């Protein structure tokens, strides 16, 4: 019997990961600016290092679920759909 699905290729995983980073980066930056918060301000509220916020906003870091929740609560904004 044939499998009903295929495992994703490395290229598909890399593409999905990059798209997710872009969605998260845009969401964090837009939500933060809408609240007129600096990266430092968001970092202080969320209990996250400012460099981490910067790396997330620039798409250079994939945050953990815990970090996403901290940011979401701090921005009073729902985490966007990633895939």
Regions found by a protein language model. Name each.
Residues 1-30, 34:
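N-terminal flexible/basic segments that precede or flank functional cores
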Residues 26, 50, 65-68:
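Short alpha-helical elements of helix-turn-helix
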Residues 26-41, 45, 70:
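Short basic helix-loop element that most often maps to the first helix and adjoining turn
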Residues 41, 52, 81:
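Residues in the helix-turn-helix
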Residues 47-62:
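Recognition helix of helix-turn-helix/homeodomain-like DNA-binding domains
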């Amino acid at each position: 019997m044939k499998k009903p699905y295929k495992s994703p290729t490395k290229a598909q995983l890399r593409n999905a990961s990059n798209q997710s980073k872009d969605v998260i980066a845009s969401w964090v930056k837009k939500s933060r600016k809408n609240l007129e918060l600096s990266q430092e301000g968001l970092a202080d509220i969320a209990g996250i290092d400012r460099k981490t916020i910067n790396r997330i906003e620039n798409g250079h870091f994939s945050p953990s679920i815990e970090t996403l929740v901290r940011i979401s609560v701090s921005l009073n904004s729902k985490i966007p759909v990633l895939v």
